[in-house]
Design a protein with these regions (language model features):
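Active-site helix of classical SDR
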Residues: 106, 143
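Substrate-binding pocket helix/loop in short-chain dehydrogenase/reductase
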Residues: 82-83, 90-95, 204
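Short, small/polar-rich loop/turn modules that mediate ligand/substrate recognition or access, typified
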Residues: 162-167, 232-235
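Canonical Rossmann dinucleotide-binding motif of NAD(H)/NADP(H)-dependent dehydrogenases/reductases
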Residues: 2-33
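C-terminal substrate-recognition "lid" of short-chain dehydrogenase/reductases
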Residues: 212-240
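Residue(s) in the substrate-gating loop at a strand-loop-helix junction
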Residues: 127
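Conserved NAD(P)H cofactor-binding loop of Rossmann-fold oxidoreductase domains
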Residues: 74-79, 243
Length: 247
């Protein structure tokens, strides 16, 4: 078993996303970081929608490092569209990646690492869209609402009936500026509503009291703090949205 704490960060697509910032933060704090995504430039190829792929990844980590102190799912997909035109495969893809993926990840984490005597953290990025209705985001919102309740239920189960201490929680972030998902959302709004990029961004920030989106570094700081200090938040969904939830 390696001496350093080991963290698996899922979803590190590109340099400007949440996962990349989380990787940098945990590396700076001295953790051994294992990156996973559906690309070749990561430590482990991992398709969160395929059980065999997920199981292989966790087996590799156990065989290689002997421990896994935290799993931080930062992956996600948001495909906007009108309900009357929305393709079924877009719905399936959204649910599979955003919700089924969490089930497969946590299941594998428990199966491979439970009862090793170590504290464990499962802390995905969810979304304020789980609670705040937004036009054209019904699939994404439904997947994130399901994710939130999945985390609440499994936190209760793992802490009540398992010996090891588990922190199972979620960070429900608001708009994170400059990420690939943010850029795609703006592009979709521009195309669907025939508006300018400036207008699309003002629509997205209109209800945020601070008047801006989060930065990826801010999300990474919150994730590190919660993962290391947030034991009593297990089962809670932590809203990081600059007061947007207050209206």
């Amino acid at each position: 078993m390696v001496g350093k704490k080991v963290v698996l960060v899922v979803g590190t697509n590109g340099y400007d996303n949440i996962g990349a910032a989380v990787v940098q933060k945990f590396m700076t704090e001295g953790w051994h970081v294992v990156t996973a995504d559906i690309r070749d430039d990561v430590d482990i190829y991992l398709d969160v929608t395929k059980k065999a792929s997920v199981q292989d990844a966790f087996k590799y980590i156990k065989d290689t490092y002997g421990r896994l102190d935290a799993v931080l799912p930062c992956h996600g997909v948001n495909i906007l569209g009108k309900i009357e035109e929305y393709p079924e495969d877009h719905w399936d893809k959204t649910i599979d990646i955003n919700l089924k993926g969490l089930f497969l990840l946590l299941q594998a984490y428990v199966q491979h690492f439970d009862n090793d005597g170590l504290r464990k953290v499962f802390l995905p990025i969810t979304s304020d869209t789980a609670e705040i209705p937004k036009t054209s985001t019904f699939a994404y919102g439904a997947s994130k609402a399901g994710a939130n309740h999945f985390l609440r239920c499994t936190a209760r189960e793992l802490n009540k009936y398992h010996k090891d201490p588990w922190l199972v929680s979620g960070l429900a972030v608001g708009m994170v500026a400059g990420t690939p998902m943010d850029k795609k959302t703006i592009a979709d709004l521009v195309a669907q509503r025939d508006i300018s990029e400036e207008k699309a961004r003002s629509m997205l920030t209109a209800n945020i009291p601070l008047g801006r989106g989060l930065t990826t570094d801010e999300v990474a700081e919150w994730m590190y703090f919660t993962a290391t200090k947030g034991d009593y938040s297990s089962g809670c969904i932590l809203r990081i949205d600059a007061g947007q939830c207050q209206g």
